[in-house]
Amino acid sequence: MSRAALLSLTLTDFRSYERATLRPDGASVYLFGANGAGKTNLLEAISLLSPGKGLRGSSLIEVGRRLPGEATGRAWAVAAETEAPQTDFGQDEPVRLGTGVELAGAARRIVRIDGETVPPGRLADHVRPIWLTPAQDRLFLEAASERRRFFDRLVFAGEPAHAGHANAYDKAQRERMRLLTDAAESGQPADAVWLTALEARLGAAGALMANARARTLMALQAEIDSRGDRPFPRARLALTGEWEKLALVGVEIAEIEARLAAALAAARPRDGAAGRALTGPHRGDLAIHHVDKDRPAAECSTGEQKALILNLVLAQAARLSRAKDAPNPILLLDEVAAHLDLKRRAALADEITALGLQAFLTGTDQSLFDHLKGRALGVRVSELGLTALEDV
């Protein structure tokens, strides 16, 4: 296993930072300071060292620093050095990662590893951030799409190929629906050969998506069940989508692929009239049940819901930390400690230490991280910049 840990992080014209450098040297970090000081901006920068839009889901234009009167965000960059993989011949020099845009308003970001421009997916070979933010506080009250997005990020952390399958599925889905809606509006039949080809692509990508979700869910459930000694609520997980259910009961990928393609072909008139596809892995949902209280998570208190989600993220981190062929995750926990009681804050600190992972945590009050003192780097975030404490 390659231990994923940041040795340094440098932001240039990113959000509120003109330029800032943090040097954790592989240690966990707790960031504290007033609301609006820029703590979450640092976590967002780390989250962009992975494919996708990061923990805020922002566009590239939004993250560039913008001064009053400027119409668009500036060109920005995030650079980091990470620990190199340990091999039989020792450890190499640190790996240099970088991402950003070279022109203000650019719609595509550049990714470089050791100075070489590479596809964003290559970042997953070196760091795999997993995050939990206040935006997930309403996870059980939001639409199913938000829970799918949350769960798919957990899947991706363990199986980076999942993102490619999801992108291929979404692209084919858009093409198919454009054909069907155009046909419905014009009254002319859609190109059947083209539709069949698209549905074959949807079947292939959708079957892989459903299988990866099912595989991740079973592994996560086993991990959660083994964590009964932690002071976090136990969860029972379920995937409600029909295609994920097939994967969960052991139906082969080829069979799911064939069934999904056939179901889509049969649903052409219905989907064209509805203006959306009514079957497929894009319709599934994640259900979480509080075991000890025997009730759905949506019916639990806000505090218990947050603890359930945190335990789910920690279970995924623990599972991935034992992987033999991939870097372990970097945990990004935004304003999580503030919602935990003293016992759970202590347990969270112990868990991070025991797993040997690098974690970045934020909070307004330094006292929230008393249990991490001596085990993590404390950094005060203010309008003056980043100030590392000396009590590590």
From Swiss-Prot:
GO terms under biological process: DNA replication; DNA synthesis involved in DNA repair; double-strand break repair; SOS response
Predominant localisation class: cytoplasm
GO molecular function: ATP binding; ATP hydrolysis activity; single-stranded DNA binding
Chain sites annotated for binding ATP: 33-40
PROSITE patterns named among the record's database cross-references: RECF_1, RECF_2
UniProt keyword annotations, A-Z: ATP-binding, Cytoplasm, DNA damage, DNA repair, DNA replication, DNA-binding, Nucleotide-binding, SOS response
A matching Pfam family: SMC_N
InterPro entries in UniProt: AAA+_ATPase, DNA-binding_RecF, DNA-binding_RecF_CS, P-loop_NTPase, RecF/RecN/SMC_N, RecF_2
UniProt cross-references to Gene3D superfamilies, sorted A to Z: P-loop containing nucleotide triphosphate hydrolases, RecF/RecN/SMC, N-terminal domain
Localization annotation: Cytoplasm
SMART domains: AAA
Cellular compartments per GO CC: cytoplasm
Protein family (similarity comment): Belongs to the RecF family.
NCBIfam families: recf
Known role: The RecF protein is involved in DNA metabolism; it is required for DNA replication and normal SOS inducibility. RecF binds preferentially to single-stranded, linear DNA. It also seems to bind ATP.
Protein name: DNA replication and repair protein RecF
Organism: Caulobacter sp. (strain K31)
Phylogenetic placement of the source organism: Bacteria, Pseudomonadati, Pseudomonadota, Alphaproteobacteria, Caulobacterales
